[in-house]
Amino acid sequence: MVSTEIRVRYAETDAMGIAHHTAYLVWFEVGRTEYTRAMGLPYRQVEQSGTRLVVVEVSCRYHQPARYDEVLVVQTTVRVLTRATVTFAYEVRRQDDQTLLVEGSTVHAATDSGGHVKRIPEVVAASLTGTGRKTKG
Amino acid sequence: MVSTEIRVRYAETDAMGIAHHTAYLVWFEVGRTEYTRAMGLPYRQVEQSGTRLVVVEVSCRYHQPARYDEVLVVQTTVRVLTRATVTFAYEVRRQDDQTLLVEGSTVHAATDSGGHVKRIPEVVAASLTGTGRKTKG
Amino acid sequence: MVSTEIRVRYAETDAMGIAHHTAYLVWFEVGRTEYTRAMGLPYRQVEQSGTRLVVVEVSCRYHQPARYDEVLVVQTTVRVLTRATVTFAYEVRRQDDQTLLVEGSTVHAATDSGGHVKRIPEVVAASLTGTGRKTKG
Amino acid sequence: MVSTEIRVRYAETDAMGIAHHTAYLVWFEVGRTEYTRAMGLPYRQVEQSGTRLVVVEVSCRYHQPARYDEVLVVQTTVRVLTRATVTFAYEVRRQDDQTLLVEGSTVHAATDSGGHVKRIPEVVAASLTGTGRKTKG
């Protein structure tokens, strides 16, 4: 599990005075980026090597709202890995009292840069589950 | 079922050259706005009368990508209505060939303007299911 | 001058209860897209033919706020055209009372798809100023 | 001058493969938030005490693009302070080679929470220019 701090931006709030529900999906994406960096193979490099992890499913439950300037923590982990898909799970908490704000998950399919489905390359799969990193030790 | 046309904006695309997955949730929201207007009680008026329909759950499946300047159609309907929640369902299609791009649903809880959960007022419930409109006829 | 209708989305509002100031720049972009379509050479085709009009300057003055669900009109025109740049100007008005909300302009440089500055192709320049369309008549 | 680190999010890129030009204005806003925090009076508290600093003017020049996952530094300062307005200036640089990507400025008018123009309260003015902090020393 990889933790990433996020501070709610004014632009992310809406007329209800709280963070808009789409902001959490952007923060999940930031969480994924940091997860892959922590695992030793940043998503930027995954893309540069010709693999995209395209979002094919999103699911999200909102428990409590977040407000402008609050510091949140996104906890990101990989829950399922198949030949061609990976499922990330997320929890977003308010940092100061650890209240759980939102839980969610995203499923991604591997494609080449032309958008055609393919298997997840072994080096990517290994880094996503942390087995790649362990092997190095 | 209420249909709303959307044209993909450049700002909604990402470095994959396709509409970012969060754009669909914004389009769902546009679909809801138009659904409530078509049912005779625009969401703006619902809020002004002291009821908010806060997003508590989102789920979304992505089948095909959308690209800049394509015209899409969001079909919005109410699937479930309980005392305190309403569930909307959406389908997003490319207009020119009717390809199904994305399906999703959102669950909303009714709150007052202070964010406290409450029952959905009868006039709002009636308009959401169309029974309010029929009564007028 | 080309007019485009925009309805303010909930996602475009912020905690002040008004449209966030960045939303207008997105609407300018929508205005440009519709301007180029009205002139007979949609920006999508400009890009497909290998020319990008990259934003190099933005300037914007905000007079009055816009609110959720209001219908706005973006008026877009080309103010200056040089060999390698084009300047668009915009006015955003509230539709129902024609109040001027925001004025702005954007300067764009022509580049190839690799991002290298180049001259604006003659067919693009002609369509931007409407001289291309006139020639057809 | 207050420096703030920003990492470019995937959601902030567009189909050109670079950060969308509106992203910089959001980063300016983050820069302002951090500027006010560094000066001892976070903007959140300014708003809570009944003063809003509404954007009335934006201007921005784009020199070089930013890409997904790059770390940028936003340098924020107050350039002009009048009775009822404050002008912030910004420079955005790529962190690793200090290349200047974007320069900009925003002008803000003070209003009460109802949106009516007012003078900037003395405590806010002092914190914006740093004279408040110095006084404490």
What kind of region is each of these model predictions?
Chain A
Residues 1-55, 113-137:
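Hot-dog-fold acyl-thioester-processing enzymes
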Residues 2-4, 37, 67-71, 78-137:
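HotDog/MaoC-like acyl-thioester-processing domains
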Residues 7, 59, 107:
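Short aromatic/hydrophobic contact patches that present stacked aromatics
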Residues 10-12, 57-64, 96:
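Short, well-ordered turn and helix-capping elements at secondary-structure junctions
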Residues 56-62, 74-75, 88-89:
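Short structured motifs
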